[in-house]
């Protein structure tokens, strides 16, 4: 195991270790200040973006705030549901619409890899980790 991980884990209380198992669901109407305070005070693992994020400025404000909080020296995880087709929570300029699984199945493996790699890079550039 990574020595840094062991060192950090030893410093966490049982409550903080439990918090590291939780991603809190976040919707576009949530306040970045409220969410970052929750992550910081409860030592949560991070956030899961829910709902339809259509405002790039709201999304960037949330991700900037979350990516700057670091409870106990641990950077939060930012996750979302981005399966393609209708299941795509991030719908902002700069993030391509991912085709449905059915549409991807009709593409060549090289084309699928190119499409999903581009999408993953676009999400990573915004600050989404998973």
Task: Label each PLM-derived region with a short phrase.
Residues 1-30, 83:
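Boundary/entry segment of secreted carbohydrate-active catalytic domains
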Residues 3-5, 9, 13-15, 35, ...:
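Residue-level signal for the start and early helices of compact helical domains
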Residues 37-130:
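Enzymes and membrane/adaptor proteins characterized by extended Gly/Ser/Thr/Asp/Glu-rich
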Residues 24-30, 35, 41-44:
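Domain-core and long-helix interface of multi-subunit machines
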């Amino acid at each position: 195991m990574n020595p840094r991980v062991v060192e950090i884990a030893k410093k966490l209380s049982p409550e903080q270790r439990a918090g590291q198992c939780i991603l809190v669901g976040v919707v576009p109407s949530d306040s970045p200040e409220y969410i970052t305070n929750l992550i910081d005070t409860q030592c949560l693992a991070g956030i899961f973006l829910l709902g339809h994020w259509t405002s790039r400025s709201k999304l960037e404000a949330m991700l900037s705030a979350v990516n700057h909080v670091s409870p106990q020296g641990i950077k939060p995880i930012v996750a979302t549901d981005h399966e393609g087709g209708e299941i795509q929570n991030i719908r902002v300029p700069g993030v391509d619409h991912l085709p449905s699984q059915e549409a991807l199945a009709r593409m060549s493996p090289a084309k699928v890899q190119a499409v999903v790699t581009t999408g993953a890079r676009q999400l990573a550039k915004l600050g989404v980790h998973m």
